[in-house]
Amino acid sequence: MCSSDLCDRPYAAGVQRQRAIVIGSGFGGLGAAMRLAAAGLDVTVLERLPAPGGRASQVVDRGYTWDLGPSLVTMPWCFDELFALLDRDFRQEVELVGLDPFYRIDWPHDGTRLDFYGDIPRMQEALAELSPADAANYPAFLEASRLIHENAVLAAGRRAFENPVPFAKLLPTMLRLDAARSLAHFCGKWFSEEHIFQSMSFHSLYIGGDPYRVPAVYAALAYLQVADGVWYSKGGMYAIVRAMAQAIEDAGGRIRCDADVDEVVVRGGRAIGVRLADGEGVPAEIVVSDRSEEHTSELQSRLHLVCRLLLEKK
């Protein structure tokens, strides 16, 4: 399904850069837009909501502000690298405050409380109040988590998993590190006291993952907060959204809000643009989706999906 007004629309006079559309303005979409802008593309971000941010949006009411998504920053060097691509200094644009302790976990049903610290001996002292044996195992747990972080997370994080082959190559490493079994199983090897076990295995809940079902690769989250610290951005996480949006616009990109993408238009096996819910066609040579795989598939035209299914059956 492809209309001539979209498919054959030429570049504007004097415009020769490739056009790129990014669907969605969460951290992933904004980050992709910054990278595309740094590569010299003409970038447009299309956001369904009235303001950018996606799951990192905010609500302001009667003088109070709430972040609706993430509330803490880990691995801040990822933002450092991203902003540097556009010759910007992330730390000059967003004020980060290191947290100590990182956070506190409360169990209201029995009054237990546990503070998380970056300093390992101090953390062991806190754990020892609940279980000296588990406290003694904490350094070994962190070391095992470090190996997962460095050999699985960092190694895989910069790979494109466009087919099963790269994932298959990663499996031996995950098996060797015991990262392919559940996070709960992995943490259970080191901790038996229930509160400590829960505090070391809950990090997958950040992305809605059940510790008893997700792989132990998520144990890396426990290590990276010790390695890189846990930070709060002054003004909330939305301060980072604002800084990213500003960087995109300063690089010549555009962020269009209230722009609900209804379809990714495909011709000849390639995306050539999108069609908005109001019928407007937006042409581009590159289309990047920050939506989930399921929602992205729903955006592809029925004609394209039928053609792809027929080709796959041949």
Give the label of every model feature segment.
Residues 16-18, 276-286, 290:
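Core beta-strand elements of the Rossmann-like FAD/NAD(P) dinucleotide-binding domain
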Residues 108-214:
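Rossmann-like flavin
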